[in-house]
Amino acid sequence: GFLGTANIVAESGGTLGAVTYPMPDLAQRLETFFAMATERGLDADFHADETGDPSVATLRTIAKTVLKTGFDAPVTVGHCCSLAVQDESEADRTLDLVAEAGLNIVSLPLCNLYLQARDPGTTPRWRGVTLVHEMRKRGINVSFASDNTRDPFYAYGDLDMVEVLRESTRIAHLDHTKPHWFDAFCANPAKACGLSKSDLSVGSKADFIIFKARSMTEFLARPQSDRIVVREGKAIDRTLPDYAELDHLMTQTKEAQRMSA
C-alpha cells in the first residue's frame, strides 16, 4: 500500500508524490499524505488538475490542507491547467490560498499545449497553460519544465530547457513583461528543489552555457544549437548521441510494459 511506498521513498531520500483527483474525501486523504511525509521528513510533489474541466480544483484543496496541517516542508504542484478555464473569482480564491500556503508551481507548456483540448477531428480552443502571470504577481514561486519527453504522452522533445524557454515565451506570452522570466527557468526551479541559487560570482561553480546572441530576440529566434556548455570551467563535448545509441532505453521501456501487463 501507500505506507510501503512512503517508506521506500524515505529510504531512498526521495520526494513523496501523488496525483490528485476530485473525490469527497480528498482533504482527509491529503491530511494522511502530509502526516506520512512529516513523519519521514519528506518534501511533497503533486500532479494536479491536468484537465480543461473547470470543476476540477484539487489545487485549492492541497493549499487548504497545507495551511490546516501546518506542513512546512516544500510542496510542489505541477500542471494546474484547469485554473485557466475557471471563473476569475474562483481562480483568484485558489491563487490567494496557494500564495498563503507557499506552494511551488510548475507549468509545463509544451506538453499541456499538446495534450489539452485534444479531440479527434477538432481544432484545440485553448493552450492548456496555467495562470503563470497571475501567480507571479502574488509572489508564488513559478517554474517551467518540459514534463514528458518522447513517451506515449508526448512523442517529442529532447530534454532541452532552452527549447522550453523559447517555446514557453511564445505560448505563455512571457515577452514584453518586466521583470524578465529567466528566474522561472533557473533560480525558481532550484528554490523548489531546495538548491542554492547559482551565479557568476568569484568562487561559484563554473557551470554555465554561452550563447551567440546580442539580445533576447536573437536568443529566442534560433535553437542555439551552437551553444557552448561549460562544466567546472571547461567546455564539454556537446555532440548529441545518435538515436541508435538510445535504442536500449526503448527496449527497457517495452520490457517493463510487458512485465506490468
Model-predicted segments: where are they?
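Histidine/acidic residue-rich metal-binding segments in metalloenzymes
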Residues: 1-104, 121-144, 198
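Positions that flank functional sites
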Residues: 24, 52, 112-113, 150-151
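Glycine/Thr-rich phosphate-binding loops of Rossmann-like dinucleotide-binding domains
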Residues: 26, 85, 114-115, 219
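Short Asp/Glu-rich motifs
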Residues: 28, 55-56, 117-118, 154-155, ...
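His/Asp/Glu-enriched, well-ordered alpha-helical/loop segment
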Residues: 43, 64-75, 115, 126-213
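Active-site proximal loops enriched in glycine and acidic residues that flank catalytic Cys/His/Asp
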Residues: 48-50, 79-81, 107-110, 144-148, ...
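Active-site clefts of carbohydrate-active enzymes
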Residues: 104, 111-113, 117-118
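Active-site microenvironment of metallo-dependent hydrolases
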Residues: 166, 179-261
